[in-house]
Amino acid sequence: MSMACYYLAAAAAGLALLLLHAPLTDAQTLVPLCGDSGNYTEHGTYHANIQYLATSLPSYASSSPSLFASGSSGTVPDAIYALALCRGDTNSSSCATCVAAAIQSAQELCPLVKTVIVYDDTCILRFANDAFPISPTSNSQGMVVAWKAQNVSAAVAPAFEAAVVRLINTTADYAATDSVRRFGTGEEAFDETTFPKIYSLAQCTPDMAATACRSCLEDIVGRMVSGNLIGRMGGRVLGVRCNLWFEVYPFFSGRSLLQLPGPSPSPAPPVTAAGERSKNKRSAILAISMPTIALVLATIAAWFCSTSWRRRRLARKTLRPKSSEDEMQSFASLVLDLQTLRTATDNFSEHKRLGEGGFGVVYKGDLPEGQEIAVKRLAQTSRQGIEELKTELLLVAKLNHNNLVRLIGVCLEENEKILAYEYMPNRSLDTILFDAERIKELDWGQRFKIINGIARGLQYLHEDSQLKIVHRDLKASNVLLDSAYNPKISDFGLAKIFERDQSQVITHRIAGTYGYMSPEYAMRGQYSMKLDVYSFGVLVLEIITGRRNFGSYGSDHVVDLIYVTWEHWTSDKAIELIDPSLGNHYPVDKVLKCIHIGLLCVQPKPADRPLMSAVNAMLSSTGTVRLPCLSRPSFWVQEIGATAS
């Protein structure tokens, strides 16, 4: 939380607030509430349902346009009902990370407790053994009230309180009328000498009706007024169904969705004789300074000539830890200056924008010699820090394969973190595969070429390169396509180098994309080359079916694609899963072989998944080939609308 000092209170029916002390400081961003509805048995059915929740709920929430998911898993008495809501100003990647961390924190801070609520800055999580009504009145069950320790001064308090009430009510109105996200942010001009602006944020769960959302927020406004939060320098009331927040500094991402004018400014005082004298004095100073301009320009020219050398020196110094001299030499040749990239992208203009992810924004650029590049400009608030940047640089600079994206250069000037890659005209696989119109560009030949190319790229990483590398974040959006739809694996920020005799690593920092993670990695932090094999299996099924790894698929349940594929495979109906846009223009035996390989790659035990060299052998084989037998994969089923009252 971006605050100097906040005090908290829990208005939680049957919930205990776990805090070692108040006030809450910057280091404490998590507020867990542990319920008293009973405990579950470790390794029992309810515990297993929580584990399924951990692997699936982050995907469902982060892939939703509203960054919201609710549902249930299992049957009574071990059914678990879950709800996750990410703040409307966050992005999909940050949403998935926050929800996953909240689930993990819930189990660590409220061990074996059936009902838990976790409030984080960017997401809210609740799971319990009973459904949670879609009602404003249910918001007080597990509510947290937090306020800034400092009051505003008595001189401005009346005007400040009136401004806060006006702002939070207007923001609440905006959020209630947002039919997709039920989210709003606002700012109001106040007083240049004390608080230039006041900022606010309001949000409800998107499954609430507009009137119910506004009623829920109205209750919070009342609590803020009666509790004298509006006279503080900041305050928030957090509930599972709705929340409201105001500060005297911008605390949300992006521009405010609404702006309110402040009080009319006082008229400027008339110009006095003293003012005229001051103006004349400034003119005299300017006239005296003019002869020095030539000297200043000469100094600037000398500085400019040394800039390129210093840029390279800075980049090498930034990346020097844990890097050998050879690595640094290979990196130094990749340094690009910021002005070149600004010129190439028209100063990072919107019309050059290709897309946006959890790291920041990607732009199309044109270098002076005519080369087209993709410029990945990491946001200042990006989770991808200097270590991830260093990993990507030092790995990609050493790798050379037709199915891996090629790094063109890097820029670290002025606190920027920018990577430039070869430009891929067809962008990422997900932009075609999950687009109802563009998917028609991919006939079976193109799809099989993409599957083959990804498999060859992974074999190079795992077995054939001078390094043994686990990518850890293989997914459709990290597979780029050139003009001929040849695939290239990209984004090595999470990649890890393995020793040649190393088979498995355990990490406490689980990073990647839920839905593509293997069970042993998502649940226990264990990863190996077989993590990438699992992700590849998911990709194969997505490419063949044209479907994401999660969705309703015409039923009253949200299920993952692995589950749907397995059910069709064991019923000898796998042919029904093939993307309808292919028509009948595909070789049935080859498609079924690819489905078999996809299911083989998502086997629950890592040892049962093939090496990528074996996958490539299976893909390139002709005629009848006996493939290994399959076991039932891991998957999760979520009932739609299960949290409705």
UniProtKB/Swiss-Prot annotation:
Positions glycosylated per UniProt: 39, 91, 151, 169
Cytoplasmic-facing ranges: 305-645
Extracellular side of membrane: 28-283
Residue ranges constituting the Protein kinase domain according to the UniProt record: 348-619
A Pfam family assignment: Stress-antifung
PROSITE patterns assigned: GNK2, PROTEIN_KINASE_ATP, PROTEIN_KINASE_DOM, PROTEIN_KINASE_ST
Transmembrane segments: 284-304
S-S pairs: 86-95, 98-123, 204-213, 216-242
Keyword set includes Cytoplasm: no
Keywords carried by this UniProt record: ATP-binding, Disulfide bond, Glycoprotein, Kinase, Membrane, Nucleotide-binding, Plant defense, Repeat, Serine/threonine-protein kinase, Signal, Transferase, Transmembrane, Transmembrane helix
An annotated GO cellular component: plasma membrane
Induction, per UniProt: By benzothiadiazole (BTH).
Active site residues according to the UniProt entry: 473
Gene Ontology molecular function, alphabetical: ATP binding; protein serine/threonine kinase activity
Keyword ATP-binding: yes
Main location class: membrane
Its EC number(s): 2.7.11.-
Ranges where the Gnk2-homologous domain occurs: 28-132, 140-251
Localization annotation: Membrane
UniProt: ATP binding residues: 354-362, 376
GO terms, biological process: defense response to bacterium; immune response; signal transduction
Family assignment from sequence similarity: Belongs to the protein kinase superfamily. Ser/Thr protein kinase family. CRK subfamily.
PANTHER family: CYSTEINE-RICH RECEPTOR-LIKE PROTEIN KINASE 10, RECEPTOR-LIKE SERINE/THREONINE-PROTEIN KINASE SD1-8
Function: Involved in disease resistance. Required for NPR1/NH1-mediated immunity to the bacterial blight pathogen Xanthomomas oryzae pv. oryzae (Xoo). Required for the benzothiadiazole (BTH)-induced immune response. Probably regulated by the transcription factor TGA2.1.
Name listed for the protein in its UniProt record: Cysteine-rich receptor-like protein kinase 10
